[in-house]
Every structure is written in C-alpha cells, then in structure tokens.
C-alpha cells in the first residue's frame, strides 16, 4: 500500500502543480521533484503531517517534502474494528482523502516559500478543498474506494 500512496501523492502533486502553473505562471522556486510518502505512524494529535526541508549539496539546494499519515487510516482501510468512538468517521475513506488533500496543500504552498507550507489560513483551506475535489476524479481514488467493499475476511482465511 505504501507504493500506492506514494504514487497517488506524487501524481496528484504533479498534476495539481501543473494546474497552478497554468493559472499563476511558473513562480514556484522551491518545487520538489517528488514528495516522499513517509508511511503510516501512530499519533494521538494528527491525521497527517508534512515535513518540509532542504538539503545542501555544494552550491545546490534540494527542497524536500515528506507526508506521513496516521496508522489508524491503514487499520480502517483494512477493515479492523476499534473501540474508538466514531472510528470509521474519524479515520474512514472520506477523511483519508481529505487528509491527503490537506497535506498536499501544505506541499504546494511550500513551493513558493517553505514557511507558507505550515500555514492553516484561508488560502490553505481553499486549496485543500480544490485538491480534494480533484482527488475524487482520479482513477486511483475510485479504485481504492471500490476495494473498500473487498471481503478481507475471505482473504485472511487463505493466508498461512
């Protein structure tokens, strides 16, 4: 699944970056070639997080972006049950798509200035909504949504 999420994140990042360039011109000096998917991690205070940074190699500066998602999304995707109240609402598929859009908005805003990538202002909220609407049109999201109906219990019976 990690390859899937890295693919989804980068395909959306590149496509949406192209949309913004057509809209505003190529004014994004801190673009990254890729966004690393840092995996799923347990957290009690975030759905997702974005790490922004830069690496200096001689006179070259490489800007880095990495997205992490809460492990509870993976549990929910896998059909695991939880005693957490409203677990599927809090970590279900719709919230996962919203969280990916939210973190991608941080990455896209950081293309202009790294500090902008940490903001939660009106422009971040609007960009998150736009990216989320875009995500729902992608075949990658439609396929993952289809797989939500997959009978994991049947698969697990055949595992050794």
Residue ranges and their predicted role:
Residues 1-3, 103, 109, 149-155:
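A short, surface-exposed helix-loop junction/capping segment
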Residues 114-159:
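Post-HExxH zinc-binding segment in Zn-dependent metallohydrolases
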């Amino acid at each position: 699944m990690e390859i899937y999420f890295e693919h989804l994140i980068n395909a959306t990042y590149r496509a949406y970056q192209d949309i913004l360039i057509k809209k505003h011109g190529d004014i994004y000096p801190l673009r990254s070639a890729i966004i690393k998917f840092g995996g799923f991690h347990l957290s009690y205070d975030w759905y997702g997080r974005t790490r922004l940074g830069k690496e200096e190699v001689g006179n070259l500066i490489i800007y880095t972006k990495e997205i992490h998602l809460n492990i509870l999304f993976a549990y929910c995707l896998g059909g695991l049950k939880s005693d957490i109240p409203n677990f599927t609402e809090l970590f279900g598929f719709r919230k996962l798509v919203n969280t990916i859009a939210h973190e991608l908005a941080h990455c896209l805003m950081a293309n202009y200035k790294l500090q902008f990538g940490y903001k939660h202002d009106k422009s971040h909220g609007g960009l998150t909504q736009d990216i989320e609407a875009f995500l729902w049109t992608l075949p990658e999201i439609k396929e993952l949504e289809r797989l939500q109906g997959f009978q994991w219990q049947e698969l697990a019976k055949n595992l050794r």
